[in-house]
Design a protein with these regions (language model features):
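Bacterial N-terminal signal peptides
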Residues: 6-16
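Sec/Tat signal peptide C-region and signal peptidase I cleavage site
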Residues: 15-23
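Beta-strand-rich domain onsets/edges
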Residues: 22-32, 103-158, 163, 167, ...
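N-terminal targeting signals for Sec/Tat export/insertion, comprising classic cleavable signal peptides
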Residues: 29-60
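Short, ordered, surface-exposed loop/turn motifs in non-cytosolic proteins
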Residues: 46-50, 167-177
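Short amphipathic beta-strand segments in non-cytosolic proteins
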Residues: 54-64, 173-186
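Glycine-centered loop-to-beta-strand initiation motif
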Residues: 70-75, 189-203
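Short acidic/polar inter-strand loop motif in beta-rich domains
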Residues: 91-99, 213-218
């Protein structure tokens, strides 16, 4: 199949959007599973209380609570026993662009001369082990793997489907290697929200997508901006 990647570098608007599109994913940090907030290779500090929910999933599809451990500049997560996947939601609050073009973490009514305001929500789905058969959960934005990534290897095809509020989202490109090549994008999703990617890394893989929903009746913001990721780490043999 064709594996055409488009770089948004040629389009100033797309570059600006990508630069602002921080996401979250989970990754091992000193033996713990950390909730990482950043863009590309960036690993930024954040207030751990912004993590609003972490749910573990068993192979049966059952949901279980996960334990969130607040640290000084981030949060760790302890998935439920036997969890094969988990979802994380981080509410980054409302960001308003002032008359000087700079954004502040305040609602529109508190910024004189505000140009625009957006409520930023970050969502992650992490595949922990083989056997995860996830379905859309109805979140504002999510990426669902249509094949078990943990059974694949680098270079293998990985079909995915994008959903917004539980419905397939057509016409959006995905960031195919968000950590290592943060501007590389896939072809756009088809009418069913589907697109076939390929596994980029023999290790941590993070795939991202962004989508905004207008809020015309809300005086404090103009839209809700979602950034969702699908992440997984291919298993390695024992050293």
């Amino acid at each position: 199949m064709l594996r055409q990647l488009s770089l948004a570098l040629a389009v100033a608007g797309a570059l600006t959007s990508a630069a602002q599109a921080h996401g979250i994913w989970t990754a091992q940090r000193h033996g713990d599973l950390a909730i990482v907030y950043g863009h590309g290779a960036g690993d930024d500090a954040y207030k751990p209380e912004k993590v609003k929910g972490v749910v573990s999933y068993l192979a049966s599809g059952e949901r279980r609570d996960s334990k969130v451990l607040h640290q000084a500049k981030n949060a760790l997560v302890e998935p439920a026993q036997d969890a094969v996947a988990l979802t994380v939601i981080l509410d980054n609050g409302v960001w308003t662009k002032g008359p000087d073009g700079k954004s502040v973490n305040q609602p529109k009514s508190q910024v004189p001369g505000a140009q625009s305001a957006s409520h930023s929500i970050k969502i992650n789905t992490t595949i922990l082990k083989s056997g995860a058969t996830l379905k859309p959960t109805g979140q504002g934005l999510e990426i669902v793997a249509l094949a078990d990534p943990m059974t694949l290897k680098m270079g293998d095809d990985l079909p995915v489907q994008v959903f917004a509020d539980g419905k397939p989202l057509a016409g959006v490109p995905l960031y195919v290697d968000y950590v290592n090549d943060g501007h590389a994008q896939s072809n756009k999703t088809d009418q069913d929200g589907k697109v076939t990617l390929f596994v980029r890394n023999d290790g941590l893989n993070v795939i991202g997508v962004s989508h905004a929903k207008k809020t015309p009746d809300n005086a404090e913001m103009d839209q809700v901006s979602y950034f969702a990721t699908l992440s997984f780490t291919l298993p390695h043999g024992e050293d």
